[in-house]
Amino acid sequence: MISGIQRLPEKSEAVLRPTKAARRMIMKNRENDKVYKLVLTALMAALCYVAFTFLKIPIPTPGGDTTALHIGNAFCVLAALLLGGGYGGVAGSLGMTIADLLDPVYITSAPKTFILKLCIGLIAGFVAHKIAHITEDHDSRYIMKWSLIASVAGLGFNVVMDPIVGYFYKNYILGVESSAAKIMATWAAGATLVNAIVGTIVVVVVYMAVRPVLKKAGLFMKIK
């Protein structure tokens, strides 16, 4: 005894210390979680690619450019809701950028796409997980409300920034004449708004349908 404080018996201390087997199990679970996240990130990137490449409606614009109606951005947001802003943003940016790189019409937009889609995921993920904590136990009304708000935040950012970034990118990086770049940006803004409205509906409907299925299967991840 030292100053009235008794030291626990060695056997008791041994019980309190995690065993090597327990530590290995914890590390293995962490590795499994990481692998699952990477697999799901790749899956969401593939869905973004497919949604843009095969489910888009191209719209030629004055000045020789082309914009499109598509739901690729919806999967960027859905990835952020399921995986968090970081992994979700990477999934969206990779999937959509690869789609641009493999399409001669959109290949010059790839750098812009990578940045904007990453931001969509980061913003939607921040609202969903840092503000609303939607992966915790809440009623369906709360989940629907905040998945809607997160979608509006991420896709709303894109509605504002896509034409602005697109204008400067085409004008200063690609060397497109200012007046032509403005016309292209205006057309792109209209298509981006339609995509955002449709995308928001898709995100909320799909997330509300997929969430209980993943929970029942034990595959739903809680994002802190």
For each of these PLM feature ranges, what is it?
Residues I2-L8, S12-K224:
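Loop-helix junctions at membrane interfaces
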